[in-house]
Every structure is written in structure tokens, then in C-alpha cells.
Amino acid sequence: MAKLDIRTKSCLVTGAAGGIGGATAAVLGRERARLVLTDLDQRALDARADALRAAGAEVLVARAVDLTDAAAVSRFADEVHAAHGPMDVVLNIAGISVWGTIDRLTEDHWRRLLDVNLMGPVHVLSSFLPPMIEARRGGHVVNVASAAAIFGLPWHAAYSASKFGLRGVSEVLRFDLRRHRIGVSLVCPGAVATPLVEGLEVAGVDRAAPSIRKVEQQFLRHAVTPEVAAEAIVRGLRRRRYWVYTSRDIRLGHLAQRWFPWGYSLAMRLLNRQLTGAAAKAGVR
């Protein structure tokens, strides 16, 4: 497919109140895209929309929607389409994270992660893709997964399940939508310094413990800013890339997983040992 000219394109951005979603909306706004924004917090979303408009961006809609509610997403889509027509680009960025070993993760943890990280994007795609297809002018879908959709990271069983699921959806749509001239990008960020990290829940572990704080600081030392991640996302969108990485370490790790599986396996074992040791020092709640 030819490169995508983002100017004047209608772009839906979920998770737009802050973090990667907010930064991506800002980059798209500078590219003169027409923005439809959603998140859970209407007040934070309004503040983001005001800041974007003050910077010269065109914000068509900024509406709080619970993406886990299929009916609410459908109503939102109907309102957007009635007022502004089909979207040209859909960016599924909203997400949550919970870490924990399998014996500490609860049924609620699994449900919340799958509902938000997998079914949320599914609801968005189900409501916004049909009009995009019917418009017959092409388009693009961006699904933001995670490095946890590539690697078997320790304590990520439930989170990885949700993100591997989104990766699977993306892999199928990559080929299903091609005949409609709709491209698909799968974004796999590594460490990104966002509020998601600050509010991260680690099941059954005291996050305030020095050993856990040390692990978090090591994580953040490798983190890129949301702005760097957003630039990578929009660059991948413009070039219609399928695999989009926000940092070099994830790209290299993905190559190592495929071509040096013994090295990948060793790295995962060492990382698992490090986190297990940190949890043992912190104590289990």
C-alpha cells in the first residue's frame, strides 16, 4: 500500500486523555488530522481536547466512553458517524495493566484485563470498521499491544493473554482488510513512562518494598517518553507498517527470539529469577 497522508484524515484515538494516547493525539493534531477522542475520564479528556485545540488541532469530538460496554461503544459510533462520517484511521490505544504470578492473580484481574485490553478494541473495531469498509476509500487500523504480546515476560500471564489476543486479531485483520485497502499496524511498546506504570498493580506484592521499587526503577531506566512512542506510532501509520516498535530494545529482542531462541530463553529465565527474588524480599501480602 502507498504511504498514508494523514492531513485532514478523521482519526479515532482511544485512551486519549493522557499517556501514549494523549501524545499520539497531539502528533496527529500537528499533522492536521481531524480528531475523535475518547477515554473514561471526561474531565481529563476535556482538558486534553482544550490543550490540543489551543495548539491548533481540530478536535471533532471528545467523549468519555466505557469501551468494555459494547452497547455504549455502538451508540458512540452511531453519533460520530451521523455527525462526521466514517473514520479514516482507528487507533486502539486504551489499556490497563496488572502483573502477578498465576497463584496471585484473581478471576477479577483476568476479567478486567481481557475486557479492557481485548474486548475494548474488539468493540471499537466492530462499531467503526463496517462504515470504513462501506465508504470504500481505504483507511488504517492501529492496535497498540505490548512487548508482552511478543515475549513471555515474568508475571505477565493475564496481561499477555489480553495483548496476545489483540495481536491475533491484528494478524487476521492484516490480511482480511487488505482487499478493502485498509492497512493494519500492531504496535508493541516496551517500557514507556506513563501514568499506567505509576498506577501499576502487582498482585499480592507490596509495591512500596525497596526490592520492588528497585525493579521499577530499572524498568523506568529503559523507558521512552509517551512523545517518543507517539512519534513511532504515527511514523508507522504513515508508512503503513505492520510491526511497529517504540524502542530499539524490543525490535532487537524480537529478532533474537526468532533467530537466537537459546539467548531469548536464557534472558527470560534470568529476568524471572530477578523478579522472583525481588518478590521474596518484599514479602507476599
Predicted regions and their residues:
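Residue(s) in the substrate-gating loop at a strand-loop-helix junction
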Residues: S146
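SDR active-site lid
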Residues: R179-R248
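Canonical Rossmann dinucleotide-binding motif of NAD(H)/NADP(H)-dependent dehydrogenases/reductases
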Residues: A2-V36
